[in-house]
Amino acid sequence: MSTTLLSAFYDIDLLYKNEKVLNNLALSTMLDKKAVGSPVSSTNSNLFPGFLRRHSASNLQALSGNTNPAKFCPNNNQLKEPAAGSTALLNRENKFRDRSFSENGERSQHLLHLQQQQQQKAGAQVNSTRYKTELCRPFEESGACKYGEKCQFAHGFHELRSLTRHPKYKTELCRTFHTIGFCPYGPRCHFIHNAEERRQAPGAGERPKLHHSLSFSGFPNHSLDSPLLESPTSRTPPPQSSSSLYCQELLQLNNNNNPCANNAFTFSGQELGLIAPLAIHTQNPPYCRQPSSSPPLSFQPLRRVSESPVFDAPPSPPDSLSDRDSYLSGSLSSGSLSGSDSPTLDSNRRLPIFSRLSISDD
């Protein structure tokens, strides 16, 4: 009989403990806030219909423990520990079903990392034009560089590269440096700071020489010392024209004719060369040179001033008081020129206009 009583008490105690465990599980499932997505168990959902949630992952694991009551033996602490561990495992497996988890989070971080790498590569490509074109200062001073092989500056002259410059690099003066005496760019400035920095622009050879024509009086300019401004007579001889031949014929006639025949003015050889271009101004002659060693010559073929179209006066009306022919003949025949003396008029001879006036008064 004693054994029967003991077995009865044992069954009552076991039922009490199981009921207590189930009550604790019901309270824990009410406080569970996990997301939906877990399948519903048809066998265990009828036990506690008022306290269970359809899509809770922890409810499935908790109710599955009811099939094996020996697993949840007399201690409540042993029951809570495996339930918590199984819930964590289910949450890890079903994390993609949780609404609070974003699947694009890791992917966006990976894309951001790739973009940063591409930007770094692009930055290295932008600076590739100046890569290894200057010496590394820390390497020159201490012989070591913290960047090592990744340094963008040259570690020695064997790594130094030549930089491609603009065609006008160091060919013009730096306005800022020569105005205020300071340039913020320093040695990297593309303009000239000192005379030794000047370099000749590629393709710019000698400048073309300027060709200057003779002056209006026929004299070449002998004060030009620069080779860029040399006269064209030193490069090519002047072309022979009809006016120059005419000037030479005039000089030959002067050597053969009488110096005193039909001449109103007398010139020396040096002065004849000055007046000859003026005499044939209408034919635009070049400069006719007469050697200074020749004796004084007379310039017979000089035309009268009245015959030259340059010096022709406008026709005067018939009632004018001036007699042009008599005036010119009288004024030209009375003057003489020797050396640098100016022509003088005869004081005893009156001008024709004054003689006309005196006759009209009488």
From Swiss-Prot:
Renumbered residue ranges of the record's region Disordered: 100-126, 225-244, 306-362
Database matches in InterPro entries: Tis11B_N, ZFP36-like, Znf_CCCH, Znf_CCCH_sf
Post-translational modification: Phosphorylated.
Subcellular location: Nucleus; Cytoplasm
Chief subcellular location: nucleus
The keyword Cytoplasm appears for this protein: yes
Bias kind Basic and acidic residues: ranges: 100-109
GO molecular function: mRNA 3'-UTR AU-rich region binding; zinc ion binding
Domain of life: Eukaryota
Low complexity compositional bias, start-end: 111-120, 327-346
ZnF endpoints (C3H1-type): 130-158, 168-196
Region (RNA-binding): 147-188
Chain positions of motif RNA-binding: 130-135
Presence of the UniProt keyword Metal-binding in the record: yes
Example of a GO cellular component annotation carried by this entry: ribonucleoprotein complex
Keywords: Cytoplasm, Developmental protein, Metal-binding, Nucleus, Repeat, Ribonucleoprotein, RNA-binding, Zinc, Zinc-finger
Gene3D superfamilies per UniProt: Zinc finger, CCCH-type
A GO BP entry: cellular response to tumor necrosis factor
Known role: Zinc-finger RNA-binding protein that destabilizes several cytoplasmic AU-rich element (ARE)-containing mRNA transcripts by promoting their poly(A) tail removal or deadenylation, and hence provide a mechanism for attenuating protein synthesis. Acts as a 3'-untranslated region (UTR) ARE mRNA-binding adapter protein to communicate signaling events to the mRNA decay machinery.
Name of the protein this chain belongs to: mRNA decay activator protein ZFP36L2
Protein species of origin: Xenopus tropicalis
